[in-house]
Amino acid sequence: MTQTRGDRNIAWIETHARIPEGKFVGQPVRLSLFQKKVIRGIYDSPTRRAIISFGRKNAKTTLAAFLLLLHLCGPEARPNSQLFSAGQSREQASILFSLAAKVVRMSPDLNAYVTVRDTAKQLHCGELGTLYRALSAEASTAYGLSPVFTV
């Protein structure tokens, strides 16, 4: 049986990512059935845009960090692509960056390929030339950007 794009991405997350915070910090990720359904809904459909909305304290930002890493250095990565997250303030913009950076640092697999640039709020995969940046509305204009993934 052929593995779907969604199932491939679920397997990649569960193989390479680690839980960044909380009681099980550092342990391999085991996505919930709901998270798997969200991932399949995004990647097993022809859509290019997905809006994820669910209640507070349901790991939305953590799931977004996993999706970001899929596009930075995982099976969804395209060479020399740009990825962004945006927030109203610098602090808000850095939340996703901080979680994704923790996942990278805790995973020997990801840490070998991804460089974390804390002061610039960037993740860079040198092998693929992919770059993620956290942007805020406080920053100057974002003209000239052509992202393949945006949160």
Where are these regions (language model features)?
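Phosphate/NTP-binding elements of NTP-utilizing enzymes
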Residues: 1-151
